[in-house]
């Protein structure tokens, strides 16, 4: 809950572009404050942004695991959106706490990880040979909350959070390529499976490189299973694999060139020299955060499940247009246009 004491009612609401009533709603915790206004408020009161949350963040032990240091503003923005997600789930009666495999693993065991990946694919009824069209949709279909918004730092590819009450939540940096977001989503899934007890204390990849290797290997074999990769290579008569073949394979599996090159090397389809040559070619002109022949962003919808839940809540008259604007973090005129589009 926000620590907006009554003494802050002396603030002129116009200084942060809100009405006095809205400020009172923030104080009384009847309206969620959006991150942009919270930043302005923190600057006005000369307080760090985490000051406004009890015990630093609203979920207490709902801590974050990430492969890069995450600033408090990004964490608060994530928690703000998770609270909206939970709110709209309750409105439409769609709250889910998924069943999750729980296998603690500290050291890389490739055979064991492949077995777990195969078991989960079976459990989620996706088979062992078929490519996954959209891993993010797959996670959300199985009760994992995924939220996407932009961060200027490409090093922050994503992070995850968990507790028994709220469940499993993943953030993905929407500034990154679709392929990178797909891989990151399954990387974070691996942490839920193999490192769940680590969410009791905040960790980073730098503190435990071994657990990142486990998560990366799981993501690779889950998205590109060995038998499926071998079958595709054999059926297409790839005797020598150049970058042209890499692009064909990556498009089939909906992953990055980097992921495919690594899986080809792991399965003995290319040698070390070819592996290095293909990696260099993959990064040529686009850098390590770009993608050659990428999945088009226009074919991909951010926050698909959350937006559909909001739409359902509005269509069922469970929320007003102003609440729609608040949940989607858009202006009232945009909310009116969106509502009109849904109704027509």
Q: Locations of the language-model features?
A:
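Active-site hotspot residues in diverse enzymes, especially metal/ion-binding acidic/histidine motifs
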Residues: 1-344
């Amino acid at each position: 809950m926000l620590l907006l004491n009554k003494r802050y009612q002396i603030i002129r609401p116009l200084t942060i572009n809100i009405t006095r009533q809205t400020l009172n709603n923030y104080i009384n915790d009847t309206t969620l404050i959006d991150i942009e206004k919270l930043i302005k408020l923190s600057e006005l009161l000369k307080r760090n942004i985490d000051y406004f949350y009890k015990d630093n963040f609203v979920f207490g032990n709902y801590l974050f695991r990430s492969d890069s240091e995450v600033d408090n503003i990004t964490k608060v923005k994530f928690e703000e959106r998770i609270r909206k997600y939970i709110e709209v789930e309750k409105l439409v009666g769609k709250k889910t706490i998924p069943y999750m495999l729980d296998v603690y693993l500290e050291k890389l065991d490739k055979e064991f990880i492949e077995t777990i990946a195969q078991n989960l694919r079976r459990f989620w009824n996706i088979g062992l040979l078929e490519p996954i069209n959209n891993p993010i949709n797959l996670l959300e279909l199985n009760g994992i909350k995924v939220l996407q918004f932009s961060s200027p730092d490409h090093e922050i590819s994503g992070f995850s959070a968990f507790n028994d009450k709220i469940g499993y939540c993943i953030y993905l940096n929407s500034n990154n390529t679709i392929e990178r977001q797909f891989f990151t989503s399954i990387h974070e899934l691996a942490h839920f499976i193999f490192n769940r007890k680590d969410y009791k204390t905040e960790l980073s990849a730098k503190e435990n490189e071994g657990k990142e290797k486990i998560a990366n290997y799981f993501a690779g074999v889950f998205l590109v299973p060995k038998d499926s990769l071998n079958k595709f290579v054999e059926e297409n008569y790839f005797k020598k694999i150049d970058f042209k073949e890499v692009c064909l394979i990556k498009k089939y599996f909906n992953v990055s060139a980097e992921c495919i090159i690594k899986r080809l090397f792991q399965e003995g389809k290319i040698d070390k020299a070819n592996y290095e040559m293909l990696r260099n070619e993959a990064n040529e002109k686009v850098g390590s955060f770009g993608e050659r022949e990428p999945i088009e962003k226009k074919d991909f919808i951010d926050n698909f499940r959350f937006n559909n839940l909001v739409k359902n809540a509005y269509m069922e008259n469970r929320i007003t247009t102003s609440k729609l604007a608040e949940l989607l973090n858009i202006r009232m005129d945009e909310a009116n246009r969106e509502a009109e589009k849904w109704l027509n």
